[in-house]
Amino acid sequence: MILGAVFYIVFIALFFGIAVGIIFAIKSIKLI
């Protein structure tokens, strides 16, 4: 159960990080 919770948190953090990275990349491209 604890392992599942940790995996869920890591998955959300990864997904959030990728989403923020994509948004940041799009903003950088628009600035250029």
Curated annotation (Swiss-Prot):
GO biological process terms held by the UniProt record: photosynthesis
Q: Which domain of life is it from?
A: Bacteria
Broad class of where this protein is predominantly found: membrane
Where is the protein found, in the record's own terms?
A: Cellular thylakoid membrane
Q: Which GO terms describe its cellular component?
A: cytochrome b6f complex; plasma membrane-derived thylakoid membrane
| Membrane-topology descriptor | Single-pass membrane protein
Sorted keywords for this record are: Electron transport, Membrane, Photosynthesis, Thylakoid, Transmembrane, Transmembrane helix, Transport
Where does the chain cross the membrane?
Answer: 6-26
What is an example of a GO molecular function annotated in this UniProt entry? electron transporter, transferring electrons within cytochrome b6/f complex of photosystem II activity
| Function noted in UniProt | Component of the cytochrome b6-f complex, which mediates electron transfer between photosystem II (PSII) and photosystem I (PSI), cyclic electron flow around PSI, and state transitions. PetL is important for photoautotrophic growth as well as for electron transfer efficiency and stability of the cytochrome b6-f complex.
Q: Belongs to which family? A: Belongs to the PetL family.
Q: How does this protein assemble? A: The 4 large subunits of the cytochrome b6-f complex are cytochrome b6, subunit IV (17 kDa polypeptide, PetD), cytochrome f and the Rieske protein, while the 4 small subunits are PetG, PetL, PetM and PetN. The complex functions as a dimer.
Q: What is this protein called?
A: Cytochrome b6-f complex subunit 6
